[in-house]
Structures are given as C-alpha cells and as structure tokens.
Amino acid sequence: MSKFSFNINHQYKKARSGIITTAHGNIRTPAFMPVGTRGTVKAMLPESVAETGADILLGNTYHLMLQPSAERIAKLGGLHKFMNWGKPILTDSGGFQVMSLSKLRKITEEGVSFNSHINGDKYLLTPERSTEIQHLLGSTITMAFDECTPYPATFEEAKTSMQLTTRWAHRSREAFVKRDGYAQFGIIQGSTYEELREQSAKDLIELDFEGYAIGGLAVGEGQELMFKVLAPDFLPQNKPRYLMGVGKPADIIGAVSRGVDMFDCVIPTRSGRNGQAFTKYGTVNIRNSKYAEDNDPLEADCLCPACQNYSKAYLHHLVRIGEILGAMLMTWHNLTYFQNLMSRIREYIALGKDFDFTT
C-alpha cells in the first residue's frame, strides 16, 4: 500500500500544483472536493461524480454518526464500499455541524454534548470519539476535532476557542490510528486575528500532522479580511493546505495564489439544485423566463451531459416544474465546471502563468 505523501510538481509564485498519494489513489492539487454529507453527493451517482473529474469527496462525521451510525457503516465494510466510491474520502470532524445545527449544546474541556437535530437524542462528541468514528468510516483523510469559533468574536473569545482547539488536537492526534496511505489533518483556528492564527499554526505543527486545514473562515468576514488572515505561509511547505468550506470561484483562485491546495464547498451542488449554473460567462439563473425558448446549451464546449444533450429551454422547464432530472443535470454541470476550473488552475501553474480569469 502506498504511503501518504504530497509532492509539489510545479510552483508559480506562491501557487503550487502537485499530487497527494493515498491508500485510495492520487489527488491532483489544487483540488476541489464535492460535499457528500450523508454518504452521497446530492442528486448525483458516485460514478457520475467521478466522471466530472473529482479525485476526492468529503463526508460528514456528524451526520453519518447519527444516520446510519459509524458502527453500522463499519459492519457493512466502510464508507467507500457502502457508497461505492473507490477514490479518497476526507471526513470533517463534526465540530462545525455540532456548533451550527444543534441548538442545545454544551462545550466543555471533555468535548461537546448535544441533542440530535433529528430526534433529540443526547450525544457526547469528544476528540477521541470523533477520531474513532472517522476510523470506523474508513476515511482516507481524518480531521482533528476542533471548535469552529463563532463570528464575530473578540480577541479573548477567539484566543480561548483557539487554545481549546489546540488541546483537542493533541487528543485527536493521540487517538489517531496511523496506517500507510491514511492521514490526519490539524485545523488552524483564531478567527480573524492573524496573531492567533500564527500561534495556532505553530502549536499544531509540533504535532506533525500529515496536512493542515485552515478553519473558521468564510463565515461572514468577507473576502478581503479572509485573504488577510489566511496565513498559509505559517504552514509547512511540504504538506497539503486545505481551506475549509470555501468554494466561490474567485475565492478559490485567490486562495490558490496564496498557497492553498484543497477546497470543499456545497456551492456547486446547492446552487445546481436551486437552478443556478456556473459558466465561464458568469452565473445563469435557469429559472429566468428569458431561457424558456433558448435552444442553446449552458456552455457549448462543456462536456457534461447537461450541455451535450439538452438546451437551456429544457433545463428551464425541468427546474421550473421541480423535476428531479433538473437538479441532477444542473448539479452535474456545476461539478464539471468546478473540476474544469481546478484543471485550468493546475495548467496555469505548470505553465508559470498568472490567473487572468475570474471564473
């Protein structure tokens, strides 16, 4: 089995392109990870997700621990077999969802106690339990358990939260079962305070994670402030850097130019289900009546099924009447667009060219 590794093949200014080698195959970077929260990318077959060019997708610890449970998925052979996905899977730690979805939650040094948003059952999620769940799922890349600092936060609030994340990172690292081809990433926190993010990075580097994530951003602070405190330069040059929850094309391009390697976001899938398509000419709201008799495809040179086989008029019709096929085709197109964007970014880095495109 291959060892987990990251090789940078090309670098232009701060932007890098390379290959992450894992037990479940290679990941070309910079990489965009479609979000498969509950063991599925909404409105897509797993093989269709692969056809868009995705090398890796994201699963969610919080949702999978509630339904159908990590133990059941392990009994059935792990998440890869369960959902018929043979490529790498990264699972988040569950911390963000606990904070955002569970209204009745209590944070202590031990972890987070919360009530399920599904049936009200009480749970305790600790660094050890989060790491165990991800191991049961068979995650290729496991995330350390963290507290996603609420925004806005005062300096002292952000410092207290960041220090808790650091202590939890120590426990997550101790609980992680090291195996060839598998990895665990630590998560940098610190809200919008560069000083705290630098300290968080220094603390987590001591734990020698296989990669590092930048968490707690894209939560309302705006692009300018996000880029100001992004701080990938604080992280090791030879390990992957993952900006969590960021997926607007302009944000991806800006973050890559600052040295980030991995991204995930629900934007392409959620937007697709809501009738919004990403194109190189800008976004298209297919619900708009001006597309009712438009016989042209979304993008003539796009190779996705939506563009190769159907007109904007047909997609308009499907979305307006709420047909499932509309959500499927729009999602397929958006995921293809995002993978094409990443491919173009990798090509520009290899050629040593500035990113002269915005979408």
From Swiss-Prot:
It comes from the Bacteria. The active site is at D92 (proton acceptor), D264 (nucleophile). One of its GO terms (cellular component) is cytoplasm. One of its GO terms (molecular function) is tRNA-guanosine(34) queuine transglycosylase activity. Zn(2+) binds at C302, C304, C307, H333. Catalyzes the base-exchange of a guanine (G) residue with the queuine precursor 7-aminomethyl-7-deazaguanine (PreQ1) at position 34 (anticodon wobble position) in tRNAs with GU(N) anticodons (tRNA-Asp, -Asn, -His and -Tyr). Catalysis occurs through a double-displacement mechanism. The nucleophile active site attacks the C1' of nucleotide 34 to detach the guanine base from the RNA, forming a covalent enzyme-RNA intermediate. The proton acceptor active site deprotonates the incoming PreQ1, allowing a nucleophilic attack on the C1' of the ribose to form the product. This is Queuine tRNA-ribosyltransferase. The lineage of its organism: Bacteria, Pseudomonadati, Pseudomonadota, Alphaproteobacteria, Rickettsiales. The gene is tgt.
